[in-house]
Amino acid sequence: MATCNVRCHPLFAGALVLAAAWLALEPAQANLSNVIRIVLQKGRHYDPGDLYLRRGDTITLVNGDENAVHHAFIEADRFAFDAGDQEPGKQATLVLREAGDFVIQCGVHPKMKLTLHVQ
Protein backbone atom coordinates (compact mmCIF):
# COMPACT_ATOMS: atom_id res chain seq x y z
CA MET A 1 0.00 0.00 0.00
CA ALA A 2 1.45 3.36 -1.00
CA THR A 3 1.77 6.06 1.63
CA CYS A 4 0.34 9.45 0.93
CA ASN A 5 2.19 12.62 1.78
CA VAL A 6 1.75 16.29 1.05
CA ARG A 7 4.03 16.13 -1.99
CA CYS A 8 1.78 13.61 -3.72
CA HIS A 9 -1.36 15.72 -3.19
CA PRO A 10 -0.74 19.45 -3.72
CA LEU A 11 -4.47 20.20 -3.36
CA PHE A 12 -4.41 18.58 0.05
CA ALA A 13 -1.52 20.84 1.06
CA GLY A 14 -3.48 23.90 -0.09
CA ALA A 15 -6.50 22.79 1.90
CA LEU A 16 -4.33 22.40 5.00
CA VAL A 17 -2.97 25.93 4.58
CA LEU A 18 -6.50 27.36 4.21
CA ALA A 19 -7.74 25.43 7.25
CA ALA A 20 -4.82 26.67 9.36
CA ALA A 21 -5.45 30.27 8.26
CA TRP A 22 -9.15 29.99 9.09
CA LEU A 23 -8.39 28.59 12.55
CA ALA A 24 -5.89 31.39 13.18
CA LEU A 25 -8.52 34.02 12.29
CA GLU A 26 -11.28 32.54 14.44
CA PRO A 27 -10.26 34.34 17.69
CA ALA A 28 -10.03 37.64 15.81
CA GLN A 29 -13.56 37.18 14.49
CA ALA A 30 -14.84 36.58 18.01
CA ASN A 31 -13.47 39.97 19.09
CA LEU A 32 -15.10 41.90 16.23
CA SER A 33 -18.23 42.46 18.30
CA ASN A 34 -16.44 44.98 20.53
CA VAL A 35 -15.97 47.75 18.00
CA ILE A 36 -15.56 51.44 18.84
CA ARG A 37 -17.43 53.85 16.55
CA ILE A 38 -16.82 57.59 16.46
CA VAL A 39 -19.88 59.79 15.89
CA LEU A 40 -19.38 63.47 15.11
CA GLN A 41 -21.84 66.05 16.42
CA LYS A 42 -21.51 69.10 14.22
CA GLY A 43 -23.74 71.54 12.36
CA ARG A 44 -26.86 70.37 14.21
CA HIS A 45 -26.60 66.78 12.99
CA TYR A 46 -24.91 63.49 13.81
CA ASP A 47 -22.49 61.97 11.32
CA PRO A 48 -23.36 59.23 10.54
CA GLY A 49 -27.10 59.45 11.14
CA ASP A 50 -27.67 55.67 11.30
CA LEU A 51 -25.44 52.99 12.79
CA TYR A 52 -25.73 49.21 12.68
CA LEU A 53 -24.01 47.75 15.71
CA ARG A 54 -23.75 44.71 17.94
CA ARG A 55 -24.21 44.36 21.66
CA GLY A 56 -20.95 45.23 23.37
CA ASP A 57 -19.93 47.84 20.80
CA THR A 58 -18.93 51.28 22.03
CA ILE A 59 -19.74 54.61 20.43
CA THR A 60 -17.96 57.85 21.21
CA LEU A 61 -19.89 61.06 20.57
CA VAL A 62 -17.52 63.92 19.75
CA ASN A 63 -18.72 67.54 19.76
CA GLY A 64 -17.01 68.90 16.64
CA ASP A 65 -18.68 72.31 16.76
CA GLU A 66 -16.58 75.35 17.64
CA ASN A 67 -19.28 77.17 19.62
CA ALA A 68 -22.33 74.93 20.07
CA VAL A 69 -23.09 72.81 23.12
CA HIS A 70 -24.78 69.42 22.56
CA HIS A 71 -26.67 67.21 25.01
CA ALA A 72 -27.00 63.63 23.74
CA PHE A 73 -29.53 61.35 25.41
CA ILE A 74 -31.59 58.18 24.90
CA GLU A 75 -34.94 57.52 26.53
CA ALA A 76 -36.18 53.97 25.93
CA ASP A 77 -38.21 51.48 27.97
CA ARG A 78 -35.26 49.27 28.83
CA PHE A 79 -32.29 51.54 28.18
CA ALA A 80 -31.40 55.12 29.05
CA PHE A 81 -28.34 57.30 28.44
CA ASP A 82 -27.61 60.95 29.22
CA ALA A 83 -24.28 62.51 28.26
CA GLY A 84 -25.08 65.83 29.89
CA ASP A 85 -23.97 69.09 28.31
CA GLN A 86 -21.05 68.58 25.95
CA GLU A 87 -18.97 71.67 25.39
CA PRO A 88 -17.12 72.05 22.06
CA GLY A 89 -14.33 69.48 21.72
CA LYS A 90 -15.70 67.24 24.50
CA GLN A 91 -16.76 63.64 24.04
CA ALA A 92 -19.05 61.10 25.67
CA THR A 93 -18.82 57.31 25.49
CA LEU A 94 -21.66 54.79 25.45
CA VAL A 95 -21.36 50.98 25.62
CA LEU A 96 -24.34 49.30 23.94
CA ARG A 97 -25.45 46.49 26.24
CA GLU A 98 -29.04 46.08 24.95
CA ALA A 99 -30.26 44.88 21.55
CA GLY A 100 -32.87 46.93 19.73
CA ASP A 101 -33.37 50.18 17.88
CA PHE A 102 -32.60 53.35 19.82
CA VAL A 103 -32.61 57.04 18.94
CA ILE A 104 -29.99 59.39 20.34
CA GLN A 105 -31.44 62.89 20.50
CA CYS A 106 -29.88 66.23 21.34
CA GLY A 107 -31.52 68.16 24.16
CA VAL A 108 -30.30 71.43 22.65
CA HIS A 109 -31.18 70.73 19.00
CA PRO A 110 -34.51 68.79 18.85
CA LYS A 111 -34.21 67.81 15.16
CA MET A 112 -30.76 66.28 15.71
CA LYS A 113 -31.16 62.48 15.82
CA LEU A 114 -28.97 59.39 15.48
CA THR A 115 -30.61 55.98 15.07
CA LEU A 116 -28.79 52.98 16.53
CA HIS A 117 -29.68 49.48 15.32
CA VAL A 118 -28.14 47.07 17.83
CA GLN A 119 -28.19 43.29 17.25
What name fits each language-model region?
Residues 2-6, 22-119:
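Extracytoplasmic copper-binding redox domains, predominantly the cupredoxin/blue-copper superfamily
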